[in-house]
Regions:
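C-terminal charged capping/lid subdomain of soluble metabolic enzymes
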Residues: 39, 45-48, 143-189
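Internal helical hairpin/lid segments
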Residues: 107-154, 159
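A glycine/threonine-rich phosphate-anchoring loop and its flanking beta-alpha core
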Residues: 1-67
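Oxyanion-binding "anion nests"
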Residues: 66-120
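A short glycine-threonine-serine/GTX helix/turn-capping micro-motif
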Residues: 14, 33-34, 45-46, 96-99, ...
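Flexible, glycine/charged-enriched surface loops at secondary-structure junctions
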Residues: 58-59, 72, 93-101, 121-124, ...
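Amphipathic alpha-helical interaction segments
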Residues: 75, 79, 100-103, 107, ...
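Short alpha-helical scaffolding segments that buttress acidic/His motifs in well-ordered protein cores
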Residues: 44-48, 76-84, 131, 156, ...
């Protein structure tokens, strides 16, 4: 879950939402069991992302969870929020590059999301697809081992996050959306 109300009000995106700036963040883990399964799973894309970029031991905890139970331990939620807050705190003005870690899967995911017809793809589903693409690129260009990539893909599959785009979208439209992203420069993400 990305933030306090964000898990429930995904359509009400708050410009400039920043967990570090909040005076109080209230989290009710019991509310998760009231969500439709698909919405619960798509919120997991953010938890998965934070574990992948900053807390590999958390991946073991996530592998042990049963997605059908729709329960996440409060300490896991707190640790997840802390990861995001620490990254933002380290690079509040986005000048060091550290904060770019939070974009893992988002650049390509947002391009897919903006190309799809509104309502056909949940935000977390698009991010999951973007993460898969980022894992592929990280294996090819950044030294991520195939074993690490496979582990992360298995976890996405365990949580029933999409790994394959089952919509017919134009590659040209996705590339056009990608080119509009601020993180895309000189033809690279």
């Amino acid at each position: 879950a990305e933030g306090n109300l964000d898990v429930i009000l995904r359509s009400e995106r708050f410009a400039g939402h920043d967990p570090l700036k909040a005076r109080l963040v209230l989290v009710d883990p019991e509310a998760l069991i009231t969500l439709p399964a698909k919405v619960f799973r798509e919120g997991f894309a953010e938890i998965f992302k934070h574990a992948a970029i900053r807390d590999r031991p958390m991946l073991t905890d996530l592998e042990a969870l049963d997605p059908t139970q729709q329960r996440v331990a409060p300490d896991l939620i707190a640790a997840n929020l802390s990861i995001k807050a620490r990254i933002v705190e380290e690079d509040e003005k986005e000048t060091l590059g550290t904060r770019a870690l939070l974009n893992f899967g988002h650049t390509i995911g947002h391009a897919i999301e903006s190309t799809a017809e509104y309502g056909t793809l949940l935000h977390g589903e698009a991010i999951s697809l973007g993460i898969r693409a980022a894992l592929y690129l990280s294996t090819k260009k950044c030294g991520l081992t195939p074993e690490e990539s496979s582990r992360l893909l298995r976890l996405q599959e365990q949580w029933q996050l999409p790994l394959v785009l089952d919509l017919e979208l134009s590659t040209n439209d996705i590339m056009t959306a990608l080119a509009r992203d601020k993180k895309f420069s000189a033809g690279e993400v």
